[in-house]
Structures are given as C-alpha cells and as structure tokens.
A protein has these predicted regions:
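Compositionally biased terminal segments of proteins
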Residues: 1-170
Length: 170
C-alpha cells in the first residue's frame, strides 16, 4: 500500500471512530497525531529524556477529563536552549516508524519561551503534521526542573487504532 493509500485508510478509520464515539473528527484526529508523535518520541534516542504529564497522562490512566486537550505536556530532562529543543523535536519528527499515515513537518517547527509565573519557565514548540492532506496543528509545552514524586515509570499509552502503542516515561 502506498503512503497516500495508508494515509487515506487511517483518515477513514479515524472518521469512523469519531462517528462511533460521537466525538468531533478534528478532536479524534488531534489525539491520533499526538499519540503518533509520542510513539516517535518513545522510539527516539530522547525517549528517557522526557516525562509525560498533564491531560494526556490522564488519558493514559483512562481518567475522566472535563474537556479535550490539544497539546502535549512534557517534563524535559534536556538542555532547555531553544535551538537545542528545536533540534530534538525535529529529530523526533523524523524517527522512522511503521507506516501510520502521519507526517510531521520539521521545517514548520517554532520554539518560544513560556512564562507562567516568575518561578516557572518552559518552552513551547509549535509545528504541524499532515494526514491525507489534513493539516494538524501540534503544540508541545515542555517544563524543566519539576520534581516528580514518586519518580517516573514506564507506561503504555493507549492507541486509538490497532497500531503499536507508545511506551514512555510518565
């Protein structure tokens, strides 16, 4: 099957899932894209350098959520210089994995500092992905220096479709 056919097939499966679950297509598509980015992160040389946190961690725990999330929250155990983060995310975008129809656009990566208050500074990464010509905005917020208690453990993130699931730190 060609890359175009795989993308179209995956897109149709996501559309079917959204209809079956009564959820908006864009929401399910966004979750799929975030899941496949996490899968690439798990397969990358940086897999042990990031810890999943936030709303997607609640998804992994299958906890109820009040609203859908549109971004990935990570705790970074890497150099927090913007150029370095851009290189790391770009490397993850290009990790070779089993065909899943998603393409992450390394050239679209933009990084910026985020300041929630005087004691916290993180990095926001924005880029986009495509699936069968559908453009998917991606956002990752990376915090640094947070204490995680108890320490992080490996989890298997739930897969929307019958594709290999990400195994990552959380």
């Amino acid at each position: 099957m060609s890359a175009r056919d795989i993308g179209a097939s995956i897109r149709q499966r996501i559309l079917n899932k959204s209809r079956n679950q009564g959820r908006p297509f864009q929401e399910v598509l966004q979750y799929f894209a975030m899941e496949r980015f996490l899968y690439r992160l798990a397969k990358s040389p940086y897999s042990d350098r990031f810890v999943l946190k936030g709303a997607l961690l609640l998804t992994a725990w299958r906890a109820p959520q009040s609203r859908p999330t549109m971004d990935i929250d990570l705790e970074g155990r890497v150099n927090n210089k913007l150029d370095h983060i851009k290189e790391v995310v770009g490397t993850v975008c290009e990790v070779d994995v089993e065909p899943d129809g998603i393409a992450f656009n390394r050239a679209s990566i933009e990084v910026s500092r985020i300041k929630e208050d005087a004691d916290y500074e993180g990095v926001r990464v924005q880029f986009h992905a495509t699936l069968a010509r559908a453009r998917i905005p991606m956002q990752i917020d990376i915090g640094f220096g947070d204490v995680i208690t108890p320490g992080p453990t490996d989890i298997e993130y739930p897969s929307l479709l019958d594709l290999p699931a990400p195994v990552l730190r959380a």
